[in-house]
Amino acid sequence: MKYELKDDYIELFKLLKVLDLVDSGAQAKMIIAEGYVKRNSEIETRKRAKIIAGDTIEVADVIIEVII
């Protein structure tokens, strides 16, 4: 799956919401805090991590490529 950035970055929890991978912001924050999300193959626990073009996000079996 690809996500095209509209700005310079998007916060991680907002990306999960925009792509409908979670039902709410609270759920997004919970799965991030519990270590279920990887950024560039490393576990990312910062809910507001700035995701930029070139990043790859993994949630369960979904892989998201962030592009410009």
Predicted regions mapped to residue ranges:
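A basic, amphipathic helix-loop patch mediating RNA/tRNA/ribosome contacts
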Residues: 10-53
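Generic alpha-helical hydrophobic packing signal
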Residues: 4, 36, 56-58
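A detector for short, charged/polar N-terminal pre-domain segments
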Residues: 1-7
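A cross-kingdom feature marking charged/low-complexity
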Residues: 53-68
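Well-ordered beta-strand positions in beta-sheet-rich domains
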Residues: 2, 48, 63-65
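Residue-level marker of intrinsically disordered, low-complexity segments enriched
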Residues: 8, 16, 62-64
